[in-house]
């Protein structure tokens, strides 16, 4: 059945009535949970100041000008980023020099003094570490000593999670077309809850990574399928607005992470609290109906009619008869008769030199958008001041970014908004690099601006990509772009660690990519008020003619999500 005829359903029962609003906010609520887990590692994997634990009971501690009886008292004097030696004398009289990753035993034990020129022996930290617990009572790092030669274990927590995100989009996108959207929404959200709780009760690092990996697969699967679910229940007149603002609920998840991190300072309790956000949706999701689009595609017309009747009843509108709409296809009076869906390969995105260049530019924009989105968020806790407030503000600033996209894309054009957002993000990254690191407030403000612009670019790239390709490869183009974007998400936490080379290295990388992407976007055509094309020939003709015709962005989302929901994923 032609997908255009299905829109007659919404013309009858309403494009965004009470029923769709009810379903929309139920589904969007779970997006908060996904946003939570995507950034939960910001505080889960905090690595506090630490020093080697001495091999015995301490009788006296000397640190700079502080003399005390226990090591825990020295953290107020500790300098961040400075390798300070701590002198301790054990109850057996042995004197040790302690650093963050090594300890030295002095041969001469006559006096506890920094001035020492005698022999000393080096030993690894076999007795573990003592951590500064003034901020966090416990983190994953302190739980399993992920410091020094095990530091890279801690640095893999977020990249492995993002790899799970990549895998989950593929798995659940495939399953949703076979088993239905409703079942997959229930399974993925249940997985988010169960694996989120399981991560809090893991017994070692490896089981924690596995639980988080499965959590990422489930959360990513939900984000993929909920986008399809929402767009198949919302009519064309409201579809673009509704789909873009699903991002806003993800941003609320970022704020919840910041608030929870502020009030809960033990990692496993923090993990349980964050995972509990999923409970309301898990309890309610069994009430969600299957989408009429999926039911019709599977020949379940009676079930589809029941859902349509329910929509009409809730919306207080006139119900439509599905049999009448279906008959339009059979008598040929509207739409087209169903045809076999032809499989297309990635090579078709390189149809010719011009299209191949277009594809590579869009892939770069997808990569830059995801890389910048997570780099600004993850790096916010390193800007100074309150890391909790910083992260909270990074979530707040996303919401006006999506409003900008919705208001601006139909007025000044998709390409112009994208160019402005990318170049502004590049300029903001440059501004951050010239702000002295002691100016915490200005660094946070500039980072918020960077997150605003890169968020706007990311919120628009899905729609823009869909409009640049003909119907025969539209889903493939969007799916490949989102996959490249997820690679950027995997790289983002690794990019943050480059700050150990130079404090502003992450901003330099993001700013450079945003600048290059913004300049290259000038080579792409504008799609505002241009008709969607079906074949490559139409695409070439439209590009060469430059003719402007009336169309709506909502049609793009309808075509992409209905024709091949497996590849159409709006996934962070």
From Swiss-Prot:
Glycans are attached at residues 57, 315, 559. GO terms for molecular function: amine transmembrane transporter activity; carnitine transmembrane transporter activity; organic cation transmembrane transporter activity; spermidine transmembrane transporter activity. GO terms for biological process: acid secretion; carnitine transmembrane transport; cell differentiation; flagellated sperm motility; monoatomic ion transport; organic cation transport; single fertilization; spermatogenesis. Its main location: membrane. InterPro entries: MFS_dom, MFS_sugar_transport-like, MFS_trans_sf. GO terms for cellular component: cytosol; plasma membrane. Belongs to the major facilitator (TC 2.A.1) superfamily. Organic cation transporter (TC 2.A.1.19) family. Facilitative organic cation transporter that mediates the transport of carnitine as well as the polyamine spermidine. Mediates the partially Na(+)-dependent bidirectional transport of carnitine. May mediate L-carnitine secretion from testis epididymal epithelium into the lumen which is involved in the maturation of spermatozoa. This is Solute carrier family 22 member 16. It comes from Bos taurus.
């Amino acid at each position: 059945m032609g997908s255009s005829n299905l829109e007659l359903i919404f013309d009858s029962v309403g494009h965004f009535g009470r029923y769709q609003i009810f379903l929309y906010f139920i589904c969007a609520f779970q997006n908060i949970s996904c946003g939570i887990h995507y950034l939960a590692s910001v505080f889960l994997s905090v690595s506090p100041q630490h020093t080697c634990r001495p091999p015995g009971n301490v009788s006296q501690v000397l640190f700079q000008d502080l003399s005390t009886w226990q090591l825990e008292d020295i953290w107020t004097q500790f300098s961040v980023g400075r390798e300070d030696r701590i002198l301790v004398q054990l109850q057996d009289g042995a004197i040790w020099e302690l650093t963050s990753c090594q300890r030295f035993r002095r041969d001469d034990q006559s006096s506890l003094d920094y001035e020492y020129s005698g022999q000393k022996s080096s030993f690894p930290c076999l007795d573990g570490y003592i951590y500064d617990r003034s901020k966090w009572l416990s983190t994953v790092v302190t739980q399993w000593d992920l410091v020094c030669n095990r530091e890279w274990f801690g640095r893999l927590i977020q990249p492995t999670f993002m790899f799970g995100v990549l895998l989950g989009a593929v798995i659940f996108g495939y399953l949703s077309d076979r088993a239905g959207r409703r079942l997959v929404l229930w399974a993925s959200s249940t997985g988010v809850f169960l694996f989120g709780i399981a991560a809090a009760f893991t017994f070692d690092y490896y089981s924690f990574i596995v639980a988080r990996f499965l959590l990422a697969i489930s959360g990513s699967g939900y984000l993929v399928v909920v986008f399809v679910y929402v767009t198949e229940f919302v009519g064309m007149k409201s579809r673009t607005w509704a789909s873009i603002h699903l991002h806003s609920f993800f941003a609320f998840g970022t704020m919840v992470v910041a608030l929870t991190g502020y009030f809960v300072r033990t990692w496993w309790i923090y993990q349980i609290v964050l995972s509990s956000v999923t409970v309301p949706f898990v309890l309610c999701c069994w009430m969600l109906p299957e989408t009429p689009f999926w039911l019709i595609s599977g020949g379940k017309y009676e079930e589809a009619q029941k859902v349509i009747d329910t929509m009409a009843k809730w919306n207080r509108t006139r119900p439509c008869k599905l049999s009448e709409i279906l008959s339009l296809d059979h008598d040929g009076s509207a739409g087209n008769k169903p045809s076999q869906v032809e499989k297309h390969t990635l090579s078709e995105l390189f149809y010719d030199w011009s299209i191949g260049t277009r594809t590579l530019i869009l892939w770069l924009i997808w990569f830059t958008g995801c890389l910048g989105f997570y780099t600004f968020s993850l790096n916010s806790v390193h800007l100074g001041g309150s890391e909790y407030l910083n992260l909270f503000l990074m979530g707040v600033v996303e919401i006006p970014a999506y409003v900008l996209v919705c208001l601006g894309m139909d007025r000044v054009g998709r390409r112009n908004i994208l160019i402005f957002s990318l170049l502004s993000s590049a300029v903001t990254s440059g501004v951050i690099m010239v702000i002295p690191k002691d100016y915490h407030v200005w660094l946070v403000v500039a980072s918020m601006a960077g997150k605003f612009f890169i968020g706007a670019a990311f919120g628009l790239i899905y729609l823009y990509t869909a409009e640049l390709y003909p119907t025969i490869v539209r889903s493939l183009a969007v799916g490949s772009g989102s996959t490249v974007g997820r690679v950027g998400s995997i790289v983002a936490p690794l990019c943050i660690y480059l700050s150990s080379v130079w404090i502003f290295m992450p901003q330099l990388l993001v700013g450079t990519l945003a600048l290059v992407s913004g300049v290259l976007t000038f080579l792409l055509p504008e799609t505002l008020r241009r008709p969607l094309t079906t074949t490559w020939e139409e695409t070439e003709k439209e590009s060469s003619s430059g003719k402007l015709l009336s169309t709506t962005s909502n049609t793009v989302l309808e075509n992409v999500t209905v024709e091949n929901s497996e590849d159409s994923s709006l996934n962070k």
